[in-house]
Amino acid sequence: MTQQLQSIIDAAWEDRANLSSAAAPKEVLDAVEHVISDLNAGRLRVATRESVGQWTTHQWIKKAVLLSFRLTDNQVMKAGDLGFYDKVPTKFAHLDEEAMKASGVRVVPPAVARRGSYLAKGVILMPSYVNIGAYVDEGTMVDTWATVGSCAQIGKHVHLSGGVGIGGVLEPMQAGPTIIEDNCFIGARSEVVEGVIVEENSVISMGVYLGQSTPIYDRATDTVSYGRIPSGSVVISGSLPKNEGKYSLYAAIIVKRVDAQTRAKTSLNDLLRD
């Protein structure tokens, strides 16, 4: 079934200029809806983990998400007294209390998750935003004003602190999703974008900005890398000298590896997860 879906989506993508909500084969409409429904339920995900730091991105699923915008008309949506006009309904709009309880997710007003995102059991959404295609795994907290971008992959027992931005892939188009692996702590107002991978058990300090062009300096090895934070790293914002010290450019600095002291400062509070 998955191979058949992929073939339909890939063919529709090549013909996307000729598609619209009023001019698309039923086979394509059904395939796109099938993918969005499976993303919403966690049966499909845009990227799957092979090992620590190694992920496979399923481009055809990302194409299906993009096609869904082409094939869906805007419609009026209501949430209490609020009105919206959009193509993607909210994830919980039609769920009753029993269905919400069964999901195991806690949603604090006015948090929003779009249909096509997946939230595993034990996830807590403070007033935050989770976009279509995102996958948020068990026990993760998305704190106040944090945003999880389209197709981003968030691991188990992650804490996304207040105002954190996890970049999406839809605009501007990115090859791979931004990924935060298990047991990571992302400090307040930090931004991780452009398909950067933060490997498991890492701690990103407050106000760190990570994109594909951000130099990542490892103090222990005196090396610079890009696009990936190694497992168990503690990262702060800093700068590196350029042009023989005439000026400095922003950099993320790996100051040490996670130790017991770091864990004590960033441990999750089980009282908040009852």
From Swiss-Prot:
Binding site for substrate: R106, D143
GO biological process: diaminopimelate biosynthetic process; lysine biosynthetic process via diaminopimelate
Assigned keywords, A-Z: Acyltransferase, Amino-acid biosynthesis, Cytoplasm, Diaminopimelate biosynthesis, Lysine biosynthesis, Repeat, Transferase
Enzyme class: transferase
Pfam families: Hexapep_2, THDPS_N_2
Bridged cysteine pairs (disulfide): none
Catalysis: reaction(s): (S)-2,3,4,5-tetrahydrodipicolinate + succinyl-CoA + H2O = (S)-2-succinylamino-6-oxoheptanedioate + CoA
CDD domains assigned to the protein according to its UniProt record, in alphabetical order: LbH_THP_succinylT
Enzyme Commission code(s) on record: 2.3.1.117
Localization in the cell: Cytoplasm
Keyword Repeat: yes
The keyword Lipoprotein appears for this protein: no
Domain of life: Bacteria
Complexes and interactors: Homotrimer.
Family assignment from sequence similarity: Belongs to the transferase hexapeptide repeat family.
Name this protein carries in UniProt: 2,3,4,5-tetrahydropyridine-2,6-dicarboxylate N-succinyltransferase
Organism listed in the record: Albidiferax ferrireducens (strain ATCC BAA-621 / DSM 15236 / T118)
